[in-house]
From Swiss-Prot:
GO terms for cellular component: plasma membrane. Pfam families: BacA (PF02673). It comes from Burkholderia ambifaria (strain ATCC BAA-244 / DSM 16087 / CCUG 44356 / LMG 19182 / AMMD) (Burkholderia cepacia (strain AMMD)). This is Undecaprenyl-diphosphatase 1. The keyword Cell membrane applies. The gene is uppP1.
């Protein structure tokens, strides 16, 4: 493994870790970064899923005590059972639609115009949602993640389905959707983190089974480097985001999305971006 390949794996891991939990679309960033780094071989998709796994491990580590408490409390504690049920309910819609339309989504939406459009539209939705939040006089209805109802979870799960469109952002869809449905900003952010766990674990398992040939002796080292880079950067990002949402809104991410969407459109049609 040469040092250039090592640098590419580390850069992509950091990009994934920094963008997976921000409402900016990690998919769009990985496509652009992978193209500029000329990292678009046959197993690039598997590498992307592996580094996503590294990012979700960071969430598991950050919330390890709560996760252990939920798992051990499942047989007897109603709060643990209710929380688990909410995560399951919120996860089902995206998994069902993803399995049904995976091939069509890849065939139709993985090109510069749809991704750029999703980035810009997602940014506009965030601006609109934040304007609504500022106009509200009453506090958010759901002030604690334990106060979520199954109906709240279903609504957030339906919002997560928009993330099947490349460029829309899973975290953006769930956080902004949650806020629009009455969740406090921090509650929506934390619930989005927990929803990522089954989604990304499932995607990792699915891609591993589908492309097991990619896991060779030569590639394992590269995958491990990317995973570690994603873990570290995601851990830093998650902690930073939790502090950020306590005192800021998501307007800055909205304008960034719009600018990045226009950039994707520019590089896509200029020939600078090898869209794979």
């Amino acid at each position: 493994m040469d040092w250039i390949l090592i640098c590419k794996a580390l850069i992509l891991g950091v990009v994934e870790g920094l963008t997976e939990f921000l409402p900016v679309s990690s998919t769009g960033h990985l496509i652009v970064a992978g193209s500029f780094l000329n990292f678009n071989d046959a197993h690039a998709k598997t590498f992307d899923v592996v580094i996503q796994f590294g990012a979700i491990l960071a969430v598991c580590w950050e919330y390890r005590q709560r996760i252990v408490s939920i798992v051990t409390g499942l047989p007897s504690r109603p709060d643990a059972q209710r929380f688990t049920l909410n995560v399951v309910i919120a996860t089902i819609p995206a998994i069902a639609l993803g399995l049904l339309f995976e091939k069509k989504i890849k065939a139709v939406l993985f090109s510069p115009v749809p991704v750029a459009f999703a980035l810009v539209v997602g940014g506009a939705i965030i601006l609109w949602a934040e304007a609504r939040q500022r106009e509200r006089r009453e506090p958010p209805r759901v002030q604690s993640i334990d106060a979520l109802t199954p109906l709240d979870a279903l609504k957030v799960g339906l919002a997560q389905c928009f993330a099947l469109v490349p460029g829309m952002s899973r975290s953006g869809s769930t956080i902004i959707g949650g806020m629009l449905f009455g969740l406090d900003r921090r509650v929506a952010t934390e619930f989005s983190f927990f929803l990522a766990i089954p989604i990304i674990f499932g995607a990792t398992l699915y891609e591993t089974v589908k492309d097991w040939q990619a896991f060779t002796v030569d590639s394992l080292g590269l995958f491990a480097l990317g995973l570690v880079a994603a873990f570290v950067s995601a851990f830093v990002c998650v902690r930073w985001l939790l502090r950020f949402v306590a005192t800021h809104d998501f307007t800055v991410f909205a304008w960034y999305r719009i600018a990045f969407g226009l950039f994707v459109l520019l590089v896509g049609y200029s020939g600078w971006l090898n869209w794979a």
